[in-house]
A protein has these predicted regions:
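Hydrophobic membrane-insertion alpha-helices, especially the h-region
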Residues: 2-27
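A small/polar (G/S/T-enriched), proline-flanked helix-loop surface module common
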Residues: 30-181, 186-187, 191, 198-210
Length: 211
């Protein structure tokens, strides 16, 4: 009887170890795709942790960045896609637009109120709608080799970002992380797009208030 009890105990322990190992293996293979990205993605523009805050666990994930043009034709884009069809993407462009025109554009398309945040001349907003989070960041920028007087309104670096598919959060927290993603792209693009005026960016923008 004693031998049978020992065998049962050993079998139970072995089963637990196998189950634990199987769960660990499952996690490593099917849920750690984002963790295997570089510490910074998209030409070192965006922190991996920001992507992890936005997108759910996945088996694999890929990132891509693209820069084109210069002056008023400058663009920079960043895209992260997972095997679960979740996407976090954003683009920065030099645009001839005032801050007021920028706000009005997003306000007219949101259908509801906008979340707003600003610091040191950098403006950010996010749309409060029922679909995927869309956010934008506005930074005044006169590109090298471009005359400010050539603008009909004013030159700015405008970044737009959004999350598509399943996300790790919803509501205001989702808008916050998409805004953080857009802000990191904007900081990178301000330098690579050769904006003339030196600028010190805060580490992060003030947090949105929960809605």
């Amino acid at each position: 009887m004693r031998k049978s009890t020992k065998q049962f105990t050993f079998g139970a322990v072995l089963l637990c170890l196998l189950a634990g190992g199987g769960y660990f293996g499952y996690q490593q293979v099917f849920t750690k795709g984002l963790d295997r990205l570089s510490k910074k993605v998209c030409d070192d523009a965006v922190a991996r942790e920001t992507v992890i805050r936005a997108l759910p666990d996945s088996r694999s994930a890929e990132q891509a960045a693209k820069q084109n043009g210069s002056g008023t034709s400058y663009t920079f884009s960043c895209r992260i896609a997972t095997s679960g069809d979740s996407i976090l993407s954003g683009e920065a462009k030099i645009q001839d637009t005032s801050e007021r025109t920028w706000v009005d554009f997003y306000g007219s398309h949101a259908g509801t109120a906008l979340l707003r945040s600003s610091a040191d001349g950098v403006e950010a907003l996010a749309q409060l709608d029922n679909h995927h989070g869309t956010a934008s960041v506005y930074v005044p920028c006169i590109p090298r080799g471009v005359q400010a007087s050539a603008a009909s309104e004013s030159y700015a670096l405008v970044t737009e970002a959004r999350a598509i598919g399943d996300t790790r959060s919803t509501g205001t927290p989702l808008r916050q992380v998409v805004t953080d993603f857009a802000y990191q792209i904007a900081k990178h693009a301000y330098t690579s797009g050769e904006c003339r005026t030196p600028r010190s960016f805060p580490k992060e923008l003030p947090r949105y208030k929960a809605h």
